[in-house]
């Protein structure tokens, strides 16, 4: 089995990554950062997001494992003190995995008609620097609304527990093949109206944004930021690709939600 260990730059994460790498080598595993079959992320959810984008072109050949060195994350199933148990699980590997949906984003630029394609594991946002975002919103071919406000966020089910939740979005179970559109401080008055509620779209529908002609847009795709390009349109749909996680043990999704946002049931 070809494995790579992908770590953030924190000292504790580097120590765990070095320890894990040495144990993997000593147990006969092949370390291969170019064409891995398993990518082990050491850090938190942000580190796993970075690992996902690093290997996004080979998702059909890779399973991910998350080792967290801080707080419990939604993508990390192993703690930093469980390195020995993880190595044993890898030795007993039977190829078991669980997959989650991803978001496919197509951005068409107004100045050059250039088209860029991206995958997102968590969410995509569209804003302007310091002015109101104005964009027409289409669901499939049908016009839905004209949005005015600070911005819009489109998230995956797993991303629904991240930024989307903080702006009033619903929490979606990752078994749902769906994406969610959430407004960021929309303007609603006698002149301008939006739905003013999150929208959940199934996998056979897509979302199209056609913003006003200006160049001061800020687009975020997971942890990446793109600025200062005039955007003709942005199209969102559930991607054909999926992210695969090695399933040696898997924390129940609602247990993750409860632990992250409510606190231990045993403390009540």
Swiss-Prot record:
InterPro entries: ATP-NAD_kinase_N, ATP-NAD_kinase_PpnK-typ_C, NAD/diacylglycerol_kinase_sf, NADK. The keyword Cytoplasm applies. It catalyses: NAD(+) + ATP = ADP + NADP(+) + H(+). It is found in: Cytoplasm. The active site is at 45 (proton acceptor). One of its GO terms (biological process) is NADP biosynthetic process. Gene3D superfamilies: Probable inorganic polyphosphate/atp-NAD kinase, domain 1, Probable inorganic polyphosphate/atp-NAD kinase, domain 2. HAMAP family: NAD_kinase. Belongs to the NAD kinase family. This is NAD kinase. The lineage of its organism: Bacteria, Bacillati, Bacillota, Bacilli, Lactobacillales.
């Amino acid at each position: 089995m070809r494995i790579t260990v992908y770590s953030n730059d924190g000292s504790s994460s580097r120590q765990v990554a070095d320890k894990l790498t040495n144990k993997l080598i000593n147990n006969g595993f092949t370390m291969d950062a170019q064409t891995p079959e398993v990518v082990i992320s050491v850090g938190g959810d942000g580190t796993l997001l970075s690992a996902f984008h690093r290997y996004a072109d080979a998702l059909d050949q890779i399973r991910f494992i998350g080792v967290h060195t801080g707080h419990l994350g939604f993508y990390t199933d192993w703690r930093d003190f469980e390195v020995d148990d993880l190595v044993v699980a890898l030795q007993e590997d039977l190829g078991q995995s669980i997959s989650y949906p991803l978001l496919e984003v197509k951005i068409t630029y107004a100045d050059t008609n250039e088209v860029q394609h991206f995958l997102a594991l968590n969410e995509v946002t569209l804003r302007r620097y310091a002015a109101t975002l104005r964009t027409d919103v289409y669901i499939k071919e049908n016009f839905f609304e004209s949005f005015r406000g600070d911005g819009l966020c489109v998230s995956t089910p797993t991303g629904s527990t991240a930024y989307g939740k903080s702006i009033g979005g619903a929490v979606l179970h990752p078994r749902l093949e769906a994406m969610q559109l959430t407004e960021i401080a929309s303007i609603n008055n006698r002149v301008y109206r939006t739905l003013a509620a999150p929208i959940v779209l199934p996998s056979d529908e897509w979302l199209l944004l056609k913003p006003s002609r200006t160049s001061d847009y800020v687009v975020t795709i997971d942890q990446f930021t793109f600025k200062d390009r005039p955007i003709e349109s942005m199209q969102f749909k559930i991607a054909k690709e999926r992210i695969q996680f090695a399933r040696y043990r898997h924390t129940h999704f609602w247990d993750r939600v409860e632990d992250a946002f409510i606190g231990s049931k045993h403390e009540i």
